């Protein structure tokens, strides 16, 4: 384990464990692989394990999207013994899965983005399409993410990020992990890993990949 902590007034515990895998993009932009473990002390949630990446320069987290998998997390019931090897197998934590994920990030880092494409990207990520007709756009969030992309973000000026689809994705992950308005840092982290923030980051990855499809 590399680090651990508590959320929701110590009702939820989390821990990050390094898998030993890492990847490097141009500009010495390093990303490491982790397993994010979380459990509720009061039994309100099952123990979950997620295959997660952390970008070193900014500490942004992103669930590793696995091809052919419907979920980024594995749940372990409270009355079941925790089997680390089984969880790793279920998560698909293999060299090939990580290599595939890093290949996608590399592809994003090579895709140059025009100003209009950047604006359209943030519009799609921050527009609520749950209702019928035209969705509602979170203008404040969009403006902040755009400023992170345009140079304010940590690592925004690295060769891998500046003016690229990977830079767009990193602007979203930094916004959700570090900048989004929340009652407390705990609330922001809980959302970024397990709640609406995590869903926004997944949508951001999907939209970024659509630029290189």
Segments and roles (model prediction):
Residues 15:
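A cross-family detector of function-defining hotspots
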Residues 1-2:
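Charge-rich, low-complexity N-terminal segments
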Residues 5, 10, 20-213:
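Intrinsically disordered, low-complexity regions enriched in serine/threonine
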């Amino acid at each position: 384990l590399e680090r651990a902590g508590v959320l929701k007034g110590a009702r939820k515990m989390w821990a990050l464990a390094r898998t030993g895998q890492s990847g490097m993009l141009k500009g010495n932009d390093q990303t490491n692989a982790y397993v994010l473990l979380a459990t509720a002390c009061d039994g309100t949630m099952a123990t979950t394990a997620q295959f997660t990446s952390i970008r070193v320069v900014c500490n942004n987290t992103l669930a590793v999207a696995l091809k052919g998998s419907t979920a980024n997390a594995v749940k372990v019931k409270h009355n079941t013994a925790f089997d680390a090897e089984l969880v790793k197998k279920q998560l698909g934590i293999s060299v090939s899965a990580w290599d595939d994920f890093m290949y996608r990030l590399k592809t994003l880092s090579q895709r140059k983005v025009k100003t209009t494409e950047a604006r359209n990207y943030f519009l799609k990520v921050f527009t609520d399409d749950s209702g019928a007709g035209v969705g509602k756009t979170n203008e404040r969030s969009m403006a902040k993410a755009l400023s992170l992309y345009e140079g304010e973000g940590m690592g925004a000026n690295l060769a891998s990020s500046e003016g690229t689809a990977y830079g767009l994705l990193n602007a979203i992950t930094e916004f959700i992990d570090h900048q989004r308005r929340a009652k407390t840092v705990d609330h922001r982290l809980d959302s970024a890993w397990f709640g609406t923030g995590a869903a926004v980051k997944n949508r951001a990855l999907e939209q970024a990949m659509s630029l290189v499809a």
